[in-house]
Amino acid sequence: MFRKILSVLNPTVFVLSLCFQIILIYTIIRHSPKNLSTLKAILLTNCCFQLLQSSMVFFTQIQLVNHLVPIELWSYGPCRHFEAFMCYSMFHILQTSSLVSGLTVFLTTFMKYQAARHVRPSKKKNCFVILFISSIVLISAGCGILLVIIQALPLEIREKYYRINLELDEYSVIGIVDYSVLPSRVNGIIINGLVVIVPITCLLLRRKILKLLTASSDALYFQNRVFLQGLTLQIFGHTLVYVPIFICSTISLITKTEYTFAQFFIFVLPHLTTVIDPLLTMYFVTPYRKRLMVWLRLKNDKVHSVSPSTFAVSANH
């Protein structure tokens, strides 16, 4: 049953994601005011990695068979027709791109929190935050590269998967996740840890932003209410598609109980954010919303002045 649903859902989400992300990238590049330069860089980074995430989900369509020891990766996507190491490499690209997407949500929330406090972070602080996030991504990506070299590229392993997949038609076995191997363990700690830490941190920052705005004037709160709505939807959206499915998958891993829904949807549910996020950005970032309204002929195409805002990093949200 799940395969029938996913045979329609996966390509549909991929096509929608491709369309919305391309439109958003064009809008960001062509219609971002100068005072949105920082947000522009963050959003473009997020768009590129979400495009990568969406492509990898579609081409791999992985079932994480985590009640087996070691965990097996089965691919139902187009890449199952290629050698297993290619699909296994795509799996690690998928993990890294999903990681970057989640961390950009945290970075955006953090920058907006600083702006709500009327604090412009020093270059040293900005560099530290970006370096910290980059180091997490690089460590995870490095572990992925090591795992491909160790667990997928050796000739005897490639021949083993070739023989296994000769007897399979609907899917291919593309690799394993073995937490007894150090790079896999490190990667697991990073990814599973951030699935919990990032949403909690973002929710706490959102709460602080709300307090700061509530304590300010009514005019200031009204001016930034649209921004707050968009921020709330994005944070809760990521929390809902990541946290429950990962908790279910972790329980399955520990108890060795087969939860088929979690196995099939652990990468599909986060895939939905690649469609939802560009829609939220287009609507809740004021300059992009104005441009969208012009395209939909709901507003005249004329130059709009950018109103001052407490959010220096993302003015007039």
Curated annotation (Swiss-Prot):
Cellular component, GO annotation: membrane
Gene3D superfamilies: Rhodopsin 7-helix transmembrane proteins
Chain segments annotated as transmembrane: 5-25, 90-110, 130-150, 185-205, 235-255, 264-284
Principal location listed in the UniProt entry: membrane
Keyword Signal: no
Keyword Magnesium: no
Membrane topology note: Multi-pass membrane protein
Protein's cellular compartments: Membrane
Keywords noted in UniProt: Membrane, Transmembrane, Transmembrane helix
Family: Belongs to the nematode receptor-like protein srd family.
Record protein name field: Serpentine receptor class delta-44
Species the sequence originates in: Caenorhabditis elegans
Lineage: Eukaryota, Metazoa, Ecdysozoa, Nematoda, Chromadorea
